[in-house]
Every structure is written in structure tokens, then in C-alpha cells.
């Protein structure tokens, strides 16, 4: 992409209601803009990031043997009444009527719809296990939408549902999805913890949450720095009467609090703030029994499916990545999530030598399937550089006055360090860095 053709409306000021870094920088960097309360449009850069995250999620799920589907965003209220969740979801579930006064729901999740899809289509234990997922729009009518993409009303979510002939097989799939989720978040370059959690309105006997560690997180966790142990304080009896008090404390305040007990590995435990980006549940027969979704076992007996459900906040991950990776200048995207991993910046577009080299490197990187943007605009160098830091391209290749001596600069967004390299070896150096 040439910057002169790209729609990237950057801004100097953040919205007045933006308090979190991700909200400020995603709007200022031209990734998103607000359509209404808790409703956001994804602009070209934001859409690229969203699709890159979606691609990682899809690739790992497909490798784990999951099947992608796409369900209707609108579901009949009758499904929710039969499962008993039409009341449990409360006002977060937005109901609508069609011209015939039939009542529908803008789906906040899809357990009921997925059970209805499988019901009478999967009838034998021989067809199990089965894991179906979608990456689709959801809507929850949040009372106080805030924090940009972290607490919106409309969002993109991956929701998956597995069907089994036994509890043991359901637990096996639950464990497989836990490992698959770990692979997804690791590929995205995130520091995260898996913690025991409360099942809430979804229901079921066991659940785990996946939290990106960030100072701005709404949840308070107890984590061990020596092993992978983590727990949401909501699940620990010792802290249940202090949940509101601890959740309201800042990360700096939590750092000063001491936890008396040790981790099972012998190391000290610490409070951390987390942003929930994934949640997996062991549902048992809660939904299949309520919706009379049965299969025939090896003895010909009719039984309700054992189920589990698995969710990832795909659009929430866009914000969570920046909450964990930013500085005072703007976004710092991880390599897997960056809209463009290389930004070629020509300091003076009127200089034929600079433009010629820029065009040559741009063509070579595109031929090598590198996600590259070529800043061929006539803006001042300082303006271009500030925009590059705000947007957060991992590497900016600067072609400027040093070219007279045969050199170009490569700026690393994460370290903010620049190196000078021979212009003839710039391509090879970039390819080495982005591996």
C-alpha cells in the first residue's frame, strides 16, 4: 500500500472520554472511530489488524480439528426461553420485533442456536465428538459502554461449541482447547495467564479465563512469577468479601499489597490486573437437555449431548494488544498483529535517488509477500515520523540525507533505536529482522 492512497485519518487529540491508552491511540492512529455509544467502525488499518487476529485464531482452531460455520446474528426469542436464559441475560440482551411482531434477539452468544443446528443432524455416538465455531458479530446492551473496544456493545467474537458422548471426552476437548488458546495468544505475542473462573450466566461446572496482563485491566488476579499459576480473586474464598475493593485499586496500589500464602511451587504470589480475552466452559448437559438435543449411544439409548463452549474476544484483542504494548508516542504492535510490519519512509519525495530506492525496496518487499506500506507523501519528515510512531509499525526504513553516503536507517518501534545500514543491504537486513 502507498501511503498517498491509504485512508489513515490520524489525529493529534484523543476523544475527551478516552481514558485508556488503547482507546486514545486506536482513535488517534486512524484504526477506529466511534459510531455511537459502544459502537465502533473499523477503518482500513483497524480492519487489517482485526483480520490478522482472526486469521491466527482460525488457523489454530482448524489445526485442532474444529469446523467453522456462520450462524445468523438474529435468533428467535423462543430458543432463549426454552433454555431459561431469556431472563438470566437480563437487559444486556437486546430484543427486537419484526413487522409481524415476532420477537427476536441480537445474539450476545449462541449456545442455543448451535444446539438447534446440531439437533437431529447429529444422532449417533459414531458422529461424535464434534467442535463447531464461528467468528461473528455479537451484541450486548452494556449499561455503561466505555474504554473503547474493551467494553463496547457490538463486538467480534469467536464462539465455539463442542458435542460429546461422555463427560470424559468433553473434558479431553476442554483441555485441548485450553492448549489451543495458549498457542493463539502466544502467537499474538501476549503476556497472559490462564486462571480458574466463575461460570456466571453461561452456566456449567467448570471454567477458565484467559487474561492479558495489563495495568488497565478490570479484573484482579493472583499470579505466580515462577510458574504459570493464576487465579481470579472471585474464585478464592479468602478474597470474596474484598472483590470490589481490590478491583477498584490501581495496579500501583496492588503492587504494595502482600499475599501471605505461597504458591504450590514455593514462590511468592502477586496481585496483577488482567483483561479477559478468552473464556472456556464445561457445560455438561445444561443446554442439550433443555433443548432436547439427544444422540443414541452404543447401546441404542437416547442421551443429551455433553457440551463445552469456548470464546475469544477478537475485537477486544485489538485493544488488549495495545494496552500491553504502547508508550507515550503510541501503539507498539506485535509482529503477528501489525497492520504493516515495514514502513518505508522517503524523507524528501522530490529527491530522485531517494524515491528510486524507495520504489525498488517497496517492490522487492511486496514480491516477498511482506506487509509493507510506502510513505510517499509530501509531508515533513517530523510529521511522518510522529505518525509512524503513533501507528506503531514495527520497523520504519528511513531513506534520507544519509543516502548520499550510501546509507539508510532502520528504526525499531519497540526499542526506539535506529541502525544505519548500507542501502544495498537494506532489503536483506529487513528480511532478517522480520523473521
Swiss-Prot record:
Gene3D superfamilies reported in the protein's UniProt record: Anticodon-binding domain, Bira Bifunctional Protein, Domain 2
What biological processes does GO assign it? prolyl-tRNA aminoacylation
ATP-binding is among the record's keywords? yes
Q: Sorted alphabetically, which InterPro entries does this protein's record hold?
A: aa-tRNA-synt_IIb (IPR002314), aa-tRNA-synth_II (IPR006195), aa-tRNA-synth_II/BPL/LPL (IPR045864), Anticodon-bd (IPR004154), Anticodon-bd_dom_sf (IPR036621), Pro-tRNA-ligase_IIa (IPR002316), Pro-tRNA-synth_IIa_bac-type (IPR004500), Pro-tRNA_synthetase (IPR050062)
Q: Which GO MF terms does the UniProt record name? A: ATP binding; proline-tRNA ligase activity
Q: Where in the cell does this protein reside?
A: Cytoplasm
Instruction: State its Enzyme Commission number(s).
Output: 6.1.1.15
Q: What Pfam families does the database record attribute to this sequence?
A: HGTP_anticodon, tRNA-synt_2b
* Catalyzed reactions per annotation: tRNA(Pro) + L-proline + ATP = L-prolyl-tRNA(Pro) + AMP + diphosphate
The keyword RNA-binding is annotated on this UniProt entry: no
Q: Which UniProt keywords apply?
A: Aminoacyl-tRNA synthetase, ATP-binding, Cytoplasm, Ligase, Nucleotide-binding, Protein biosynthesis
Q: Cellular component per GO?
A: cytosol
NCBIfam families (alphabetical): proS_fam_II
Q: What does this protein do?
A: Catalyzes the attachment of proline to tRNA(Pro) in a two-step reaction: proline is first activated by ATP to form Pro-AMP and then transferred to the acceptor end of tRNA(Pro).
What family is this? Answer: Belongs to the class-II aminoacyl-tRNA synthetase family. ProS type 2 subfamily.
Q: How does it assemble?
A: Homodimer.
Supply the name of the protein: Proline--tRNA ligase
Q: Which organism is it from?
A: Sulfurimonas denitrificans (strain ATCC 33889 / DSM 1251) (Thiomicrospira denitrificans (strain ATCC 33889 / DSM 1251))
Which gene produces this protein? proS
